[in-house]
Amino acid sequence: MSFQAGDIVRIVACADDPRAVGKTGRVLDEVPPGPLTDYRWTVDRISIWIAPVLCHTHELRKEN
């Protein structure tokens, strides 16, 4: 599955910050992630207390 910038996603797992699991956020990346981020998507707007996180595709589910 691929995401687009602005997609709302639910974080089902997150090695970067386990506090983000179960929360929703917005994908920031305008292009598919590459080696610089270890092929992880940048997800923002999770919580005021949680900074943007990097998540692999299998850790995210697209919200409707």
Region annotations inferred by a language model:
Residues 2-64:
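Basic/aromatic-rich interaction segments and small domains that mediate binding to polyanionic partners
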